[in-house]
Amino acid sequence: MIAALESCHRVEFYSAVDFNAEYAESAREIVSKKFNNIIARAAVLDFSNKKEISTINLSEDHSNLIICLGGTIFCAGNEDYIDKVVENIANLLKAGEYFIFGADISDSEQALRPAYFTDLSYQLMLNAMHGLKQALGDSNSNFDPTAFEPVFRWNERSTTVELLLRATRSQNIIIDNTECCIIKDVLYNILNSRKTSINEIKLRLSKYKLEIVNIYETKDVFGNKFALLKTKKI
C-alpha cells in the first residue's frame, strides 16, 4: 500500500477500512506518519452489511478509488456473501471510478498442495479444536484436541482447497447435553479456500456494472497464480 500511495499523485484522503479495529488503526497510523500531505482515517466496516456501507460518504468533488487487500473477496465459499460485497462496493462508486482487488486464481493441485498443506495450516486447525474444547467447558475435560492428523484435498468441481482433520481415535463429546461421537478415521472439514477463474469473476462483476480494464498476474514459488484486477464502474 505504501508503494501504491507513493506512486500516486494528488492523493488527499486515505481511509483504512477493516473488519478489525486494531488493523484499521494500525494502517491509518502508518500512512499518517509516512505522508504529511494525506489525511488518513480508520474505519471499522463489514462490506457485506448494506446498512454499514450506507454510512460511508465518499468525495463528490474528487475521483474515488477503492482498493481491497488482504483476504481476497472471491475466495469466500459463500456465493451470497461475495455478491453482497461486490454489490455494496459497486454502489459506492460513480461511473468512471475504480475498484482494485486481488484474486487467487490458482487451479493446479500440484502447486496448491505445498502452499496450503503446511505445519502452520495444521496448527491453525488444531487451534480450532483447542477452541472447541474450551467452548464446550468442563464436561469435556477428557477431549483430546490433538488426536487428529491433517489432510489436504483439492475439490476440482468447486475449485476449492479443503483442509481437513482425520481423527486418529474415537472420542465422545457433549454438546448441549447431547453426546456426540468423533469417529476414528473420519474426516472433519475445518478450512476452505475457494479459487475463482477470471471468467467467473468477470461475469459476477458485470452484474454490478464493474468492468475489468487491467489484469496483472504473478506466480509464487510453487507456481500458484495470483492476479491484481483493476475494474471500472460503467
Where are these regions (language model features)?
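Class I SAM-dependent methyltransferase SAM/SAH-binding core
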Residues: 2-50
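Alpha/beta-hydrolase-fold catalytic nucleophile elbow
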Residues: 17, 69, 100-103
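Short amphipathic alpha-helix with an adjacent loop that forms part of the alpha/beta core around
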Residues: 50-61
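Short SAM/SAH-binding signature in class I
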Residues: 60-71
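A short, conserved alpha-helix within the catalytic core of class I
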Residues: 74-88
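Conserved beta-strand signature within the Rossmann-like core of class I S-adenosyl-L-methionine
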Residues: 91-108
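Substrate-binding/catalytic lobe of Class I Rossmann-like enzymes that use SAM or dcSAM, i.e.
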Residues: 105, 112-211
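Core SAM-dependent methyltransferase catalytic element
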Residues: 222-234
